[in-house]
């Protein structure tokens, strides 16, 4: 790296982002001056320390699925697992900037540097199954509220701490870039949807976000 703007060509492959690895992070502190006595001047104020707020380049998604159909327990379930697809194959380092969220908000402003590295392809699939990823799943009827039961929901499962590469694109309402979410059922139609975080809609998946996804399976079809 020869200068600040060389950062815009750096990216991390999608395989760097999962719950078993240290997630790539970035932080940026501006207007820093190193004083002669070894202290710092931060935004014109003398200080003995520099606080660095790291922003993860991934998003965490916790999933809760509820159904009107009893799919059974972990040993005999018709529920196979879940799949996230249309995931970007890399995450640019600059998509983690700014590293501080907006005042009084969980949200961040759009990236401040344009990405100029290897082109991003949305061809990555992340599949989690009861058979191969049992620790991620918890079939638990206590997840159902009284209101859920009154609405004839009888089965629920939680999928915890799914780590996905963040996904940014300037046209946030472009659903062709959205991450697809599929509920995989055995010998039945597997329903799917496109993930969006706001009703605007916004199909991006922000860096450093923690999102809760609740899905209702009403009437799966046999195939």
Language model feature labels by segment:
Residues 48-50:
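Short strand-edge motifs at loop-to-beta-strand transitions and within beta-strands
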Residues 54-60:
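Active-site-adjacent structural elements in enzyme catalytic domains
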């Amino acid at each position: 790296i020869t200068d600040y703007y060389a950062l815009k060509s750096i990216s991390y492959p999608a395989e760097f982002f999962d719950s078993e690895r240290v997630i790539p992070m970035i932080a940026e502190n501006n207007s820093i001056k190193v004083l002669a006595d070894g202290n710092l001047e931060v935004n014109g104020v003398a200080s003995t320390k520099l606080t660095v707020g790291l922003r993860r380049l991934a998003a965490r998604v916790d999933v809760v699925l509820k159904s009107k159909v009893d799919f059974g327990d972990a040993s005999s379930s018709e529920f196979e697992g879940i799949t996230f697809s249309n995931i970007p194959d890399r995450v640019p380092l600059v998509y983690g900037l700014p590293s501080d969220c907006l005042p009084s908000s969980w949200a961040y402003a759009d990236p401040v540097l344009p990405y100029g590295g290897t082109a991003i392809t949305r061809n990555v699939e992340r599949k989690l199954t009861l058979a191969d990823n049992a620790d991620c799943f918890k079939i638990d009827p206590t997840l159902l509220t009284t209101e859920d039961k009154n609405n004839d929901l009888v089965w629920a499962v939680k999928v915890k701490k799914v780590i996905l590469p963040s996904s940014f694109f300037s046209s946030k309402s472009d659903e062709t870039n959205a991450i697809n979410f599929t509920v995989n059922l055995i010998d039945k139609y597997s329903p799917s949807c496109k993930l969006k975080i706001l009703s605007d809609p916004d199909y991006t998946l922000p860096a450093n976000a923690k999102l809760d996804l609740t899905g209702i399976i009403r009437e799966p079809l046999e195939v």
